[in-house]
Amino acid sequence: MDIDKNRRIGLTDEQVKQSREQHGKNVLTPPLRTSLWKLYLDKYRDPIIQILLVAAFVSLILAFIEKNFMETIGIFVAVFLATTVGFYFERDAAKKFNLLTALSEEQPVKVRRNGKVMEIPRHDVVVGDIVLVEVGDEVPADGELIVCNDLQINESALTGEPVAEKSLEGGGDGAYPRNVILRSTMVMNGRGEFVVTAVGDATEIGKVAKKSTEQTSVETPLHMQLDKLAKMISKVGSVVSVAAFFIFLIHDILTNPAWGGKDYFYMAEIVLKYFMMAVTLIVMAVPEGLPMAITLSLALNMRRMLKSNNLVRKLHACETMGAVTVICTDKTGTLTQNKMQVSALELKQGDEALLDTAIALNSTAELNDGKPIGNPTESALLLWLDAQGKDYEELRKQVNVLKQLPFSTERKMMATLAEVDGETYLFVKGAPEIVMKKCIIEDRMLRQSAEELDEWQHKAMRTLAFAYKKIEVSIMRTSRTSTAEVVALLDANDLQLQAIAAIADPIRPDVPAAVQECRHAGIEVKVVTGDTAATALEIGKQIGVFEDEPENIGADGSLTSLDQQMITGEQWEALSDEEAYERAKDIRVMSRARPTDKQRLVAMLQKRGEVVAVTGDGTNDAPALHYAHVGLSLGSGTSVAKEASDMTLLDDSFKSIANAVMWGRSLYRNLQRFLFFQLVVNVAALLLVLGGSVIGTEMPLTVTQILWVNLIMDTFAALALASLPPSHEVMKDKPRKASDFIINKSIGFGILFCGIVFFLVMFALLVYCERRGKGGVDVHELTMFFTTFVMIQFWNLFNAKALMSHHTAFRHFLKDKGMILVLVLVLVGQWIIVTFGGEMFRTTPLSLHEWLLIIGSTSVVLWAGELWRTFKRMIAKRR
């Protein structure tokens, strides 16, 4: 295709078709989506689910022998519910994200085709198209410039360079030639036209996107914990059941004379009976409700976090945020407002009205309903005028511009010759070191201005100087004034210093407090930015990642020098892997960082056992976002960054990260509470089955009753405990180690203590009923026994709610609507089962007196827990 011939008219419809066939559409190929059936089957990789499936198939075989399929059906239902809930919520989040991605591809783009300028969707741009861009546009594809008028591009999304000057000539000291324009960069100033040379995956951003979707094998902390728990449960359950099988079988052989005969069918029945008991023990040891509790907790958190501006794309990210020990954050947009503002402006000579005019004229930026369009620095000056109640558009209308000399990197200043109230002025704006050399300044003013500028620059602010002079020559009052004449006026070096200004991208107001909250929670915050060392240092000081003192506390508690906490990308790259491994823990700020530097830092921190979260908004952040345990993209970030992330901060705020940590930690605590409740039920029920076999009675809890206790009630408990709101108290704790077992010593002790006590109470009741009755335990007594067991767990749900706190179980009780609903459901469900269960549940109706007696006597479980928590509160106060 002869591009030169198409510059004026653009491509024809036929050429567009040919180009699309040859080079493809202008769409970035999304990461290979897992098919729905594979996504669903992935849920069966959960180790707890796998144990349940084994138990279900063993139970199925026994069900054909025993002709009782209720238990088998119950286990399969538990598996189906747990896997389907998780699959549904992840699929729902993926759909929402795909919709956002699709909408971004519909952005209108101006192109020249068939000799006309028209707007087409971004995905329709093809190689060879002539694309027109101006201030505020996002570049839709890679290309080479053919028209360039003061074009400045924000390449920070790809190269980290905030403002890159473009020209028709190649070369330059940037990452790409100056005549090359790249997809997903933003036009900050000027206008231009370019020929598209690459679309879709062939663009530079497409190449980065491909790298960001490389598969990594970092296991999440929760998955490791569940794997460990599943192995422990399977070992304990297997050992206990096998031991019980042989103990009871040997006891029967030694005491039952039938073993001396030849009734082999009867002996096989005895073996089958004990084998059934062993399998029942294994099934009871496995917490069927745990996968449901986890998926419900994650799904509820996912929905709630969306309301607090966190769009969670992957369920595991909810919990993993609670285990985070390091947050690597970029600066622009996350810590700062990504909005330049005038921090200080000192008038030196002339009046304010003349300065207002100078600011309005020496700018190519615009404000659209208060929203800045164009160069960020010039936009900041217009916003400053607006804040002073001055209308820059009116100021521009009141003057007659004779000649304007645009800003260039060579001149480092901009000049405008204009007629104001019948007088001609030359207004100049630019770098202070350049502008002040062209001024006549008194020594005192020069020293004072130099000191102020130096102070601002050390605070990582961008500085500007304004100067002017009154022109007496009448010939200058024509529109034919040449550039050379304006340059000659500047070279006279007789300007008057009008003002100096400091412009900064201010820190978000809530960031310092959010950073401190994270640090108090034991989470190290590291700033990784492409800015200069001085700017990065100042940002670090402002948000509080380190203090102003020469010595600071390092990540391991040791004193670390400020130099040790600062590093540049170049210095980081020069370190060997061993040196980088040692240095990683103390780095607080990395300046002049490139994407590979950020990714290497994440890898080194993970190697040290840290759980790492990474924030980023640019395409250059995508690889690090993907490699981290949790990738946090910004709502205003590029589509590639969002695609690589696990969670999107819709409000771009670092405060949302602190909230996500709180949600994650609260979720983990709720899971621990559920485990405590569930395993107490399982331990007590398991011991009861063993105990019932010892005294020779039939199983005190039937299969259907066990299903109610173990499955339905546990699902209710999962709902109750998963729906507990997050607590700020968790932010006072240090991060847990990824290697720490989810059941710590105190929880483990509580499970065994409560489980054994509940068993002893229930076993004593069983023995009492056995010995009191002449013909064994009747159905009425077994109904009382069953209801007592359920009510003990009912009251223990309150203790689970208050687990790992000194507070009463009734704290914020009326706000816990999910808990209240579940308590009502358990009571109503138990009454229905007892009253109408009949032969299916082996129950008979109880009188009101019996109900009140059971409810009142079992409430001791709650009051004992309240006394223990009161005692702990008293001890804590004394300390």
Where are these regions (language model features)?
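Long hydrophobic segments that form regular secondary structure
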Residues: 767-768, 772-773, 777
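Generic alpha-helical transmembrane segments
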Residues: 713, 758-759, 783-798
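Alpha-helical transmembrane segments of multi-pass integral membrane proteins
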Residues: 749-765, 791
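Conserved cytosolic headpiece of P-type ATPases
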Residues: 1-735, 740-743, 756, 771, ...
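Transmembrane alpha-helix entry/boundary detector in multi-pass membrane proteins
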Residues: 778-782
